[in-house]
Structures are given as C-alpha cells and as structure tokens.
C-alpha cells in the first residue's frame, strides 16, 4: 500500500499530515508535511521537484496545426492520489468528531430545556 510514496523514501505514510503543490517555471513542487511531535514548533517536511511533461497536440483550428502544452508528471499524479487517500481519511475522521460533538451539544441543549420544562411544571403544582 502507498507504493509511490514509499518509492520516494517515505517509510511511514501514516505520519503524513498534509501536502502542498505549486508550480514554478516548468516544474511542479510537492511539499509533504508530517505530524508534529509534542514540543516541536515546526512540522518536519520534505520537498520534491517534478518536471512538467511537454506534449504536442493538434490545435482547435486546422490552420494553426499543433501546439505544445505542459501537464503534470504521471508519477506525481499517482503520488497525489495516494496523498489524497491519506489526507481525506484524516478529514473524514475530523468531520466525524465534529459531528459527534455537535450532536452532543444539541443533546445537552434539549435535555436542559426539558429539565427546565419539568421544573416549571413542578413549580406550578407546588403553588396550588
């Protein structure tokens, strides 16, 4: 699992926190950030540079002939797919945690309102 990341020398893909991807000239720069250990100020990161692939394709108009385009490196595409699996899995866990906390806060609110309603009913009974 995560063969492309392991081929980059990343032995523990589960330690990946996030990644960024940017383009500089004819290269794509991938930066992978790992989870911080307790007491660390900065997360450890590694950077990889991938040259963009050049392709010659036919232009829209028959008059123009061919044009050259640059696109993302195929290997980088596979690495990003694996990174998305890791980072989205973490996001799903975070979203689930937020949902559970939201449900818990809502339940607290409902119970507090019900207790107040019952106490008000008791108060009415004791006044009579």
Curated annotation (Swiss-Prot):
InterPro entries: UPF0325 (IPR020911). HAMAP family: UPF0325. Belongs to the UPF0325 family. NCBIfam families: PRK13677.1 (NF010213). This is UPF0325 protein plu0668. It comes from Photorhabdus laumondii subsp. laumondii (strain DSM 15139 / CIP 105565 / TT01) (Photorhabdus luminescens subsp. laumondii).
